């Protein structure tokens, strides 16, 4: 069965800490996950597109229909660092378009950028 629903977890987000070590966290809006509309569906695909990013992209899920701040838990994390060692995973991720399949009977999902210091998160999308 092909995926028919695509939602934006985090729209294009740009930040340049100006080289003075200012970092912050960006939290995207809650979106319904596969189980919200489709009952026992448990496969979601997350697509992340980054340009020169230093920060951690965190995908969180919830089992609550109307999640509060304490209902969220981490299901995936991508570490990106434009200043990392050559050919390291964080350096490669800093300019990447990646996807990952996330299994789980989740009701809601969201994306966060933690320790965001630099770069452009072009998009973070959820499909099911």
Task: Give the residues covered by each predicted segment.
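Short, surface-exposed beta-strand/strand-loop-strand elements in extracellular ectodomains
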Residues: 54-77, 122-128
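Short proline/glycine-enriched turn/loop motifs at strand-loop junctions of beta-rich domains
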Residues: 51-55, 116-117
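Short edge beta-strand/loop segments characteristic of extracellular beta-sandwich folds
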Residues: 47-49
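Short Trp-Ser/Thr-centered turn/loop motifs at beta-strand boundaries
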Residues: 10, 17-39, 45, 62
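Short, intrinsically disordered N-terminal pre-domain segments
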Residues: 1-20, 123-128
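Residue-level detector of short, conserved catalytic/binding motifs and their immediate flanks
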Residues: 44, 57, 109
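Serine/threonine-rich, low-complexity intrinsically disordered segments
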Residues: 7-8, 15, 27, 56, ...
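Beta-sandwich interaction modules
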Residues: 26-29, 33-41, 74-128
